[in-house]
Regions:
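Conserved acidic carboxylate
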Residues: 7-9
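Two-component/phosphorelay signaling modules centered on CheY-like receiver
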Residues: 11-36
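As written
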Residues: 97-108
Length: 127
């Protein structure tokens, strides 16, 4: 069973992603983090295969803050893949930071808000 933790700013988007992943992936368990402050603890407790976090231009979802969470999760949770989710239509600079993090091996994958549900689920399933 693939375990996935979602750390998404909007509860509506998080629950939509949860439902979509449960429909698209055969065997997965999705946990929604209550807040960025709780994500590291959720990862320690649930030992996920994937941590998906959205990245925004404001706190507490800023790129730097997400990388700090990634660092803590990497130290405490073996084999957890980190995927960043970014709205590629609104902030080109932020999108480039996320791309660069992938190039440097800091994250395992990234997704744009404009991708299809099938592609979204396939990327999460493939890491």
């Amino acid at each position: 069973m693939k375990k996935i933790i979602l750390d998404i700013q909007s509860d509506i988007h998080a629950h939509t992603m949860e439902r979509m992943l449960m429909q698209k992936l055969d065997d997965c368990h999705v946990v929604i983090s209550e807040s960025p402050d709780a994500t590291v603890e959720w990862c320690k407790t649930h030992r996920p295969d994937v941590l998906l976090m959205d990245v925004k231009a404001y706190s507490p979802w800023m790129f730097k803050e997400r990388m700090a969470i990634r660092d803590k999760v990497e130290r405490n949770t073996e084999n957890c893949r980190v995927i960043l989710f970014v709205d590629d239509d609104t902030d080109g600079e932020l999108t480039e930071k996320v791309r660069q993090a992938k190039r440097e091996g800091l994250i395992d994958a990234f997704l744009f808000g404009s991708v299809s549900e099938n592609y979204f689920a396939s990327v999460i399933d493939s890491v």
